[in-house]
Amino acid sequence: MSFLNLEELPFVGMSHEFVGEKQGVPFSAYVVTAKPGQGPPLHTHPYSEVAFTIEGTATITVGDETREVKAGGIVVVPANTPHRFVNSGKTPLRQIDIHAGPKFVQSNL
């Protein structure tokens, strides 16, 4: 069992990274803080992902569908499905991304 503080996790790019492999669990989580206009390129993961929007507004593309997602929105991304998000609001975007894998694996498209 571990008790951690968010600030103890490494901050890489735009997120604090909870890497399951380092914590002895089979999933990973990323606490994202994205500035307006910021987001990753279109990409895939070999596992499923669930994104919980906590604050702000994101434009999220999953496969061929693009939607605006606001605080409280949840997006499920199947494994190997192209997806991306961008902070489309005027304030910071905060979201928690849960990856169904013990380490981060991403293929940019």
Predicted regions and their residues:
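A short glycine-rich, His/Asp/Glu-containing loop-to-beta-strand
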Residues: L6-L42, I98
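Structural motif
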Residues: T57-T59, T66, P82, P92
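Short, conserved beta-strand element in jelly-roll/cupin
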Residues: T33-K35, H45-I60
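Ligand-binding loop in jelly-roll beta-barrel domains
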Residues: A79-F104
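Short acidic-glycine-tyrosine-enriched beta hairpin
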Residues: E65-A79
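Short histidine-centered beta-strand/loop micro-motifs
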Residues: V19-E21, G39-H45, V86-S88, S107-N108
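Histidine-centered metal-chelating micro-motifs
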Residues: G39-P40, T59, V75, A79-R84
